[in-house]
Amino acid sequence: MSMWPRSRVRIPEQTVLVARAAFPNGSVAMSARDHLGEVFTDEQFAAAFGVRGAPAESPGALALVTALQFTENLTDRQAAQMVARAIDWKYALGLELTDPGFDASVLSKFRTRLVEHSLEEQVFTRMLTVLAGEGLIGAGGRQRTDSTHVISAVRDLNRLELAGESVRACLEALSVAAPDWLTEVIDVAEWAHRYGPRIDSWRLPTSQAKKDRLAQIYGTDAVALLRAAFAAEAPTWLAEISAVQTLRVMLVQNYLITTDSRGREVIRRRETDTDGLPPAKFRITSPYDTDTRWAAKGDDLFWNGYKVHLTETCDHDDEPDTTTSDDDASRPAPNLIVNVATTAATVPDVKATTSIHQQLHERGLLRRAARA
């Protein structure tokens, strides 16, 4: 997909007239355009696009839509609808009133493209630069940092589901990477019956004895598959496939290989009370996202995912708002988010403070900070 940078976009006259009539006191979107101008330009995102292919939607406009979307807590579909029907958004984007907007899928593709080209902080950093130029943020004053949970985009799995789904994910990867080799080392019909559908607790046995037996089967299959992949006669690159590595980690964390009194090999699942499990910060919870972790905050918040630490200015929180004038210059500066840091869900808030302060220092925004 190609990108042809737009020159500075002037707001169409008809859009200005209708927007001013509809919003005589303005709106967040209109204020952003009036006070901050065109915050984002297409040139800032040129590295994420090629010079050939179908023309892309303006990345500068998509960046502004993303910022407005976050401000109003909208889904992609809702944000795309706002571009098509909201007059104040058309004003902010410099669009004609008749502009139909774009499909909602464009926003997720835009975010993906930013991540793939390591431009994920470009939007936030650019916004901070503009706000600093307006004198709304800077060094000095007070800040506060607090964290909240981020739920991962994977299905929550119990230990039995995790074992079976890890084998299934590995089989899926190997069936694509080395289909001929895979048919030589497993009974395709039997394994397809066992691992064809996704492993779901709704389909699993209800009795504990049958669950224990199934856990042993999953462990035995995992060992057999890994031994085949790491065998001397197997292609060496098979062991480097991420799904194979994930299956190996799952096996080590959840199973034990021992021998019975007759010297026979026994593969059994680890028992929490007697065998122990790895600490939560090391224990994988899904074969499809090996960074997500189970965590708790307080007595009643449990989640599988990550933690995001938000730092905002709070210079005027202790001051009552006695402003009666409509003059923006007489109003105190708003509280603004100046740093976003994502960590593993198991990282305590206090452990993230040092790295957060370093990020603020690099941006020239380090203040007298305190945890909320």
Protein language model features and the residues they cover:
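Polybasic low-complexity intrinsically disordered regions
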Residues: A84, F102-A369
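Acidic, metal-coordinating catalytic cores used for nucleic-acid/nucleotide bond scission
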Residues: G53-E57, I87, A370-A372
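DNA-recognition alpha helix
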Residues: A79-Y91
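Basic, short loop/linker segments at the boundary and entry of helix-turn-helix/winged-helix-like folds
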Residues: A22-A67, T71
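Charged, often Cys/His-bearing segments associated with DNA-binding zinc-finger transcription factors
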Residues: M1-G37
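Alpha-helix capping and helix-loop boundary segments enriched in small/acidic/polar residues
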Residues: R52-A56, L97-G101, A344-P348
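Short, positively charged loop/turn segments that connect secondary-structure elements
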Residues: D88-V106
